[in-house]
Regions:
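Glycine/small-residue-rich hydrophobic helix-like segments
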Residues: 112-136
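Short, structured motif recognition centered on aromatic/hydrophobic residues
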Residues: 11-12, 102-112, 121, 138-142
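Acidic, glycine/proline-rich low-complexity segments that act as flexible tails and inter-domain linkers
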Residues: 1, 6-7, 16-17, 23-102, ...
Length: 172
């Protein structure tokens, strides 16, 4: 079982806000080359669901739906906050092609790979758990990523998942 062409591209689009376009851009060419070699017609149908006019509103709705009512007016707290709401959540989280569970799982992997982003990793671990990607699932994801992100970042991610599970589900 692999990813469909749309899913593969959505995994890349999701990476932009977490890894940065500079790190992700080369993978678009490689992915396009692979898809073309497999006979996939490019460009793929757009998965976008927002416009420049409604991306902030839709981003805030998505952020509140996933992270809770405390995210209301988050965009008003600074320029980077606004960018997070309208670009990350308005442009990417609202796209078709990946459901919330898959999009959050991918996001969890990207943040864990960064290291030093534990507050964000905790928020996304909690949201993963609330969406059904439970502690056991996230631990398996971390184990599969050890060769790619190393032991230190993996151990940090394990600590964060334990904290997230306790926050969402209470103590065992």
């Amino acid at each position: 079982m692999g990813l469909s062409p749309v899913e593969a591209k959505e995994v890349l689009y999701q990476a932009i806000d977490y890894l940065g376009l500079g790190r992700v851009f080369p993978f678009f060419k490689a992915t396009n080359d692979i898809l073309t070699a497999r006979g996939v017609d490019l460009p793929l149908a757009s998965q976008a669901t927002t416009t420049m006019e409604n991306r902030l509103e839709k981003g805030e709705e998505t952020q509140i739906r996933l992270f809770g009512p405390q995210m209301k007016d988050f965009a008003k707290k600074g320029t980077i906050n606004k960018c997070l709401v309208d670009n990350c959540f308005g442009d990417y989280y609202t796209r078709k092609g990946l459901d919330d569970r898959d999009r959050e799982m991918v996001t969890f992997c990207y943040i864990a790979a960064q290291g030093g982003c534990e507050p964000q990793l905790l928020a996304h671990a909690q949201t993963n758990i609330k969406l059904g990607n439970d502690k056991e699932f996230l631990m398996k994801i971390i184990e599969q990523n050890v060769p790619f992100i190393g032991h230190s970042r993996s151990l940090n991610a394990v600590t964060v998942v334990n904290q997230a599970d306790e926050a969402v589900n209470g103590k065992d």
